[in-house]
Amino acid sequence: MLAPIKEHVDNNFNPLPKAYETEYEPIRRRVNELMRATYEQISTGQYANYRATLAEADGCKDYLSLVRKEHLNRMQKSHGTKMIQVDLVYLNLLQETQQLLSVMRHQLRAAKKFIEEGQGQLQSLAD
């Protein structure tokens, strides 16, 4: 996820505009909280908030889709190519964040299923 951003910085391109930082900050906080919640559930094996976490991740992905479409519209309306590299880096960040959420959701579902199947097998052995 960070490779295009690192390349962008290493090549001395312009930094992201403050407006993009401001737009992305609540997304970053929300994704960090989702990752923390997912980690807690997987590491403790306690899945009481499982459905809420998946629903929140879906909502975040939907919001990212809107932001991405809005950004694509901004790119199409902009005149000139001065900011194209910065715009592409930001677009990539939005897309990779969506992908991260998809992988996180998949990992949470798989971990829960693995635990439940293991408990089911232990129960059948005990019977």
Residues covered by each model-derived region:
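Cytosolic, long alpha-helical scaffolding segments
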Residues: 1-127
